[in-house]
Amino acid sequence: MIVGRRLKHHSLALAIGPSLTTFGVADALADPRLGIFNGATLIAENDNWSIVPAETVATAQATRDTGAFGLANGSKDAALILTLAPGAYTAQVSGADGTITGVALIEVYEVP
């Protein structure tokens, strides 16, 4: 992700794994962990987007506001709402336990 504006940027980042099965993806990553890096520094991570109630409400609203992939309550998909300064960032998805493999989709949106 490149944030090129001079102001901070509000972003929604998603790592979709188990929800892909509804679209016929057979080898979907069952429990993704999403990490956002600035260089080699991990600045945020999430596993299971709907664990914290306040974050669940904000994330659900951000997905509606941006037209992002809808997440089912209780799913093991991962999501982060971030405020990023200008710069370059990397989104990385891995299995939550470090050994799980499969197909995942990463989406990143600007939140209005």
What is the predicted role of each segment?
Residues 1-112:
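A sequence-level detector for low-complexity, Ser/Thr- and acidic-rich stretches
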